[in-house]
Amino acid sequence: TSSEAASEASESSAEADGAEEGTFTVGFDQDFPPMGFVGDDGEYTGFDLELAQEVASRLGLKYVPQPIAWDAKDMELEAGTIDCIWNGFTMNGREDAYTWSDPYMDNSQVFVVAADSGISTLADLAGKVVEVQTDSSAEAALKDNQELSSSFGTLQTVADYNTAFMDLEMGAVDAIAMDVIVAGYQMEQREDGDNYVILDETLAAEEYGIGFKKGNEELRDKVQTTLEEMAADGTMAEISNKWFGRDVTVIGK
């Protein structure tokens, strides 16, 4: 049957595609909710990871979530310890560094500040302490916008955004530059979420995609086809509604 043929095809190519034969190993930052993080039960969860798990299941591969240090993601991919980077991974500015899926989600880089900070525009960030995750898209966007970043009093990096929010809460920093999807989720989940606001002016508009090792079109094509099937049958919208209360995906639209 066609399903048996598809299963055999996926098994025969798994050795070439997988970090280990028959597996689909997804590299992600475990401190990046709601895309990928450690849930209350100690298990890895998140919007991207649920999508990845469904893709693996449909391809007949064993799903393996592999947390990585975000600044070591390229090394992990080149070494073959992961099959892809799938975790709110911005395509913009990295177009030629990976073999990419089509974009599945829009994103923008924004600034989060304390609601009572008196900061309401990008110009108000002049002389302020701004924090950003190391090797993140927000950091890259700030490097591209020297006029803005040079106006800051200090631009400092942090390992993850959970730490950044703690720094903002303590008043150690004045603003965090980060993904709007993640910022909104963090603010919804935090008991003190109403104490923060996202500035209306954005830093950069972007798209999320899945990054594969350069040249691995075979695995990329399988994943892309599966994502398109998930979009068509409503599975992608269902997973999106679970995490965001709406369909934030762009495949097939």
Language-model features, listed with the residues they occupy:
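Immediate post-signal peptide segment of exported/extracytoplasmic ligand-binding proteins
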Residues: 1-44, 57, 118-129, 253
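A ligand-binding cleft/hinge motif common to bilobed small-molecule-binding domains
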Residues: 72, 88-97, 141-146, 169-170, ...
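Ligand-binding clefts/hinges and TM-proximal coupling segments of bilobed small-molecule sensing domains
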Residues: 62, 137-156, 194-198, 228-253
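Short helix-initiation/N-cap motifs at beta->coil->alpha
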Residues: 49, 64-75, 117, 155-170, ...
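Periplasmic-binding protein-like
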Residues: 30, 106-113, 180-184, 188-228, ...
